[in-house]
């Protein structure tokens, strides 16, 4: 299997399966001298960790990360950083009934056809369990970017099913009005406090029905420097979409206004420039594939997981029709735990592009002052 490495100068290679002994990652290209401890990584891992509320999977993993290499006396050395997380709460017996059948909506059929075999225990390599290593690696990138630029990367769930987040006093949702501390204080990472109770009732009903529901996640990077992105084929927004689309269950990504631009006229959509700053940010902080210095804003659509307790039709390994019910412990809404994963993938993309920009354009000087974001 190829395709396990993300990035060009700041690279992350992950390995491991859902029900294997553990998960791991190698991060190469991290500059030396960054103060780094396991506690720095654990903060985001705990936000993603399963079994933390009634609205996520009941699988309980400590997800305690170990730094194996690349850090000496509390600082990165510039050599590859090795990370490891042990799996401790596998329950492979839950998947015995699907060993010979394909779960509809999952990677079972495509993995089987591509590789001629598959790890049916929780999906093996195709499981979202793999994303724990992305979150750990992303925490390194977030820390470096925060110290270098004061950059913050934050995400929240802005829609679950037909429940959509609003701004203050019912105004349309706006990332600039989000109280990020309140986002961390509710189990849904939801920015609209007026709908938390409604969300709880809604998801409890979904769980009773043994079903699942989709979600929308919004991720925002602030204090991004101008100039990140490598046109033509490595445009910043293209690589952001690549990183976010690689997250399990993501079926759509928008940058800035995304598909809403279809209804906009050019006179509305263009982000006019003034000496005081940009008038709007319909572009989501990227112009011509290069960061403009404005907030980078992206939205992710996550499908409802197909691992549900509702009987569905499928075929077995010999192509015969059969019915299937997926047992095991699964998230009723995978979008909730996708919040730190989205932050991680945006951080990894921006970190990689910063190093690429510095490598080629460090000596470029421009007399035009940066426009305020």
Curated annotation (Swiss-Prot):
InterPro entries: Chorismate_synth (IPR000453), Chorismate_synth_AroC_sf (IPR035904), Chorismate_synthase_CS (IPR020541)
Family membership noted in the UniProt record: Belongs to the chorismate synthase family.
Catalyzed reaction equations: 5-O-(1-carboxyvinyl)-3-phosphoshikimate = chorismate + phosphate
Names of the cofactor(s): FMNH2
Involved pathway(s): Metabolic intermediate biosynthesis; chorismate biosynthesis; chorismate from D-erythrose 4-phosphate and phosphoenolpyruvate: step 7/7
Key words, A-Z: Amino-acid biosynthesis, Aromatic amino acid biosynthesis, FAD, Flavoprotein, FMN, Lyase, NADP
Binding locations of FMN: 125-127, 248-249, 288, 303-307, 329
Entry EC no(s): 4.2.3.5
Protein's name in the database: Chorismate synthase
Gene Ontology BP term (one): aromatic amino acid family biosynthetic process
Statement: the UniProt record of this protein carries the keyword Heme: no
HAMAP family, alphabetized: Chorismate_synth
Example GO molecular function: FMN binding
One cellular-component annotation, GO: cytosol
NCBIfam families reported in the protein's UniProt record: aroC, PRK05382.1
Cofactor binding note of this UniProt entry: Reduced FMN (FMNH(2)).
Subunit structure, interactors included: Homotetramer.
Pfam families found in the cross-reference section: Chorismate_synt (PF01264)
Organism this protein belongs to: Colwellia psychrerythraea (strain 34H / ATCC BAA-681)
Function: This reaction introduces a second double bond into the aromatic ring system.
Keyword NADP: yes
Residue sites binding NADP(+) per the record: 48, 54
């Amino acid at each position: 299997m190829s395709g396990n490495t993300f990035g060009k100068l700041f690279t992350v290679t992950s390995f491991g399966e859902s029900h294997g002994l553990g998960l791991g990652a190698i991060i190469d290209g991290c500059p030396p001298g960054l103060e780094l401890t396991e506690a720095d990584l654990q903060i985001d891992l705990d936000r993603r960790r399963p079994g933390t509320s009634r609205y996520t999977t009941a699988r309980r993993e400590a997800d305690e990360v170990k730094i194996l290499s690349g850090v000496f006396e509390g600082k990165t050395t510039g050599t590859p950083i090795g990370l490891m997380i042990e799996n401790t709460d596998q329950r492979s017996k839950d998947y015995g009934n699907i060993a010979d059948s394909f779960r509809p909506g999952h990677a079972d059929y495509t993995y089987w056809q591509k590789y001629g075999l598959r790890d049916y225990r929780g999906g093996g390599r195709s499981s979202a369990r793999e994303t724990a290593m992305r979150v750990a690696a992303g925490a390194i990138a977030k820390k470096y970017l925060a110290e270098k630029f004061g950059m913050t990367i934050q995400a929240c769930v802005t829609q679950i099913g037909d429940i959509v987040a609003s701004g203050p006093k019912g105004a349309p949702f706006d990332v600039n009005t989000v109280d990020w501390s309140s986002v961390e204080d509710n189990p849904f990472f939801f920015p609209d406090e007026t709908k938390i109770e409604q969300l709880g009732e809604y998801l409890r009903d979904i769980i009773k029905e043994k079903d699942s529901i989709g979600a929308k996640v919004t991720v925002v990077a602030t204090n991004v420097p101008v100039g990140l992105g490598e046109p033509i084929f490595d445009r910043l927004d293209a690589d952001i979409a690549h990183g976010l689309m690689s997250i399990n269950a993501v079926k759509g990504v928008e940058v800035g206004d995304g598909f809403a631009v279809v209804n906009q006229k050019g006179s509305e959509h263009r982000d006019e420039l003034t000496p005081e700053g940009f008038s709007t940010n319909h572009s989501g902080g990227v112009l011509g594939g290069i960061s403009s210095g404005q907030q980078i804003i992206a939205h992710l659509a996550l499908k409802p997981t197909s691992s549900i307790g509702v009987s569905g039709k499928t075929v077995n390994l010999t192509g015969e029709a059969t019915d299937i019910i997926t047992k095991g412990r699964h998230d009723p809404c995978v979008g909730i735990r996708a919040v730190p994963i989205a932050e991680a993938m945006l951080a990894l993309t921006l970190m990689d592009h910063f190093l690429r920009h510095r490598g080629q354009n460090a000596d470029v000087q421009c007399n035009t002052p940066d426009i305020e974001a």
